[in-house]
């Protein structure tokens, strides 16, 4: 993989959020979608992290944080707080030539 051909943090966040919006209706409960849409302006967010260790239970490849990122999308208690009501965790490949993502949805 090429370190010089990676998505920036902002590009990774934007791409993960776009994928979330495209697939949310098929994967979230309608009540959760309504709550997210009503509250996102005030309490919503997307945060970028290195991939959590539990992704190893869901994927069968090395999760090098140079090339993979986890984006947590959801709602916080208050604006600026950490996201506590998680609607999706998106694992995304940051290399521009490898379009790969996995999503763990709120159950």
From Swiss-Prot:
Family annotation (InterPro entries): dsDNA_mimic_put, Put_dsDNA_mimic_sf
Protein name, as recorded: Putative double-stranded DNA mimic protein PC1_1990
Described function: May act as a double-stranded DNA (dsDNA) mimic. Probably regulates the activity of a dsDNA-binding protein.
Family per record: Belongs to the putative dsDNA mimic protein family.
Pfam families given in the database record: DUF440
Organism the protein comes from: Pectobacterium carotovorum subsp. carotovorum (strain PC1)
HAMAP family: Put_dsDNA_mimic
């Amino acid at each position: 993989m090429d370190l010089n051909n990676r998505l920036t943090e902002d590009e990774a966040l934007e791409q993960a959020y776009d994928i979330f919006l495209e697939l949310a209706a098929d994967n979230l409960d309608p009540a959760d979608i309504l709550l997210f849409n009503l509250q996102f302006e005030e309490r919503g967010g997307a945060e970028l992290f290195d991939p959590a260790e539990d992704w190893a239970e869901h994927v069968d490849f090395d999760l090098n944080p140079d090339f993979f990122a986890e984006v947590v999308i959801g709602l916080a208690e208050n604006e600026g707080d950490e996201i506590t009501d998680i609607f999706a965790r998106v694992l995304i490949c940051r290399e521009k030539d490898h379009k790969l993502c996995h999503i763990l949805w709120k159950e």
